């Protein structure tokens, strides 16, 4: 690629480019004394950015065709990337137009497909806490919540396990979280600052737990760094408290989903 192709765009978009394409191209630019078009520009690697969605959306792999298939895009006609590597080796020997068209056709589909999967960034709002809680209810066993997103999801989805279940469609997320005797787990991000107390099934800050016998405490992990609170009327009537609860806890719950 020539530098002028990147000039109008301050951020360049790619899929797996930060680990593969960019280092490869940078090495070639240096070898042939060509100015790098990446200098001074930020990058958005969709593979790395969207990777957390794999289990949530039940994606079989984070390959671009898999993401396109999830979005309902099924108009690819050229060979996949693995086949194109073989085709390229054949092309170096034969230099025939048909093989060249196959390779270029695949590359064109990949480039155009980047724009199509760009909409999947909207699902990250669920992880980032970028939503509003619009409804809450406790049915005696489960906490039921509705969340409003700032964007429209490109495809509806559903997923869950024995602890929770969620669905997403358009701009709304429906969430059901199972309670234990009317109590919920509040997870914390800074788990390295806590001790987990197995006998009490809760955590305590290390600053307060240093005096507890080592037999009764462990270093907390992402999965064990939580305390319990009652799903009270005060909690159910406070969207602010509900948002505080969900901001990190929802990501932890999603992290318990099994990959396909």
PLM regions: where:
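DEDD superfamily 3′-5′ metal-dependent exonuclease/proofreading module
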Residues: 1-260
């Amino acid at each position: 690629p020539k530098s002028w192709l990147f000039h109008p765009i301050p951020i360049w978009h790619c899929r797996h480019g930060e680990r593969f394409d960019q280092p490869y191209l940078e090495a070639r630019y240096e070898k042939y004394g060509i100015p790098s078009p990446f200098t001074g520009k930020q990058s958005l690697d969709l593979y790395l950015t969207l990777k957390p969605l794999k289990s949530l959306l039940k994606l079989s792999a984070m390959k671009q065709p898999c993401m396109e298939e999830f979005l309902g895009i099924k108009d690819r006609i050229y060979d996949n990337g693995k086949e194109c590597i073989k085709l390229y080796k054949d092309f170096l020997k034969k230099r025939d137009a048909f093989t060249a068209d196959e390779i270029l056709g695949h590359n064109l589909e990949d480039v155009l497909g980047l724009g199509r999967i760009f909409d999947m960034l909207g699902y990250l709002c669920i992880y980032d806490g970028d939503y509003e809680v619009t409804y809450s209810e406790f049915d005696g066993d489960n906490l039921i919540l509705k969340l409003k997103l700032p964007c429209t999801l490109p495809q509806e989805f559903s997923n869950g396990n024995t602890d929770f279940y969620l669905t997403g469609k358009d701009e709304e997320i429906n969430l059901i979280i199972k309670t234990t005797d009317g109590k919920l787990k509040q997870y914390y991000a800074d788990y390295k600052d806590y001790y987990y107390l197995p006998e009490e099934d809760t955590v305590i800050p290390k600053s307060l737990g240093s005096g507890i016998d080592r037999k009764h405490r462990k270093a907390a992990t992402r999965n064990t760094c939580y305390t319990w609170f009652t799903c009270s009327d005060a909690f159910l009537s406070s969207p602010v408290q509900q948002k505080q609860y969900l901001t990190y806890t929802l990501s932890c719950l999603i992290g318990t989903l099994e990959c396909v």
